[in-house]
């Protein structure tokens, strides 16, 4: 509180020459105060006040975005995805930031995980579209980032966009396949391939039963006892 008061008094004094970093430090101090590590509850009023200061810092000097990744990551690691997304959304306004790629990835993930919490009744399509754009920015900057494809596909699954579900899950498969057998043999990757084949099969089910059966067949080639693929094939007959 002492640091916040001192900074607020300094900024409020008309004769002082204020620089962007003054607003940045005030914003970061408010973020720290808002984030109660013991209760894991964020004080929304203090947090929003901190966000306002961070925005002032970035408006004055765009390179201040370079300092936002770390604070965004702290909220992200605490699974405070709403707050993390707000910070990363400011961070990615600087396309020349050294953290631009990672900031977009964490922005997309924050919005995705915020909308997949157990207490979410209905996912927010506007937030999911923002996540889709963020993952797209990662893919444009680093086309071999395979996790960006899988999360973009999952995001479009929540949006129930069959065309994009097929497109991005297939792109995930293609990018990983291009990396070779060693990558494809990893257990986590095999699980994601099964997820991809099942999702593509489900997306095709209403429009192209032949394609749907093909992809469910690919699932069973990897996991012969996969219940979802087995039941789906029965329904498609």
Residue spans of the language-model regions?
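Alpha-solenoid helical repeat scaffolds
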Residues: 1-207, 211, 228-237
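Short, exposed beta-strand-loop hairpins at the edges of beta-sheets
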Residues: 218-224
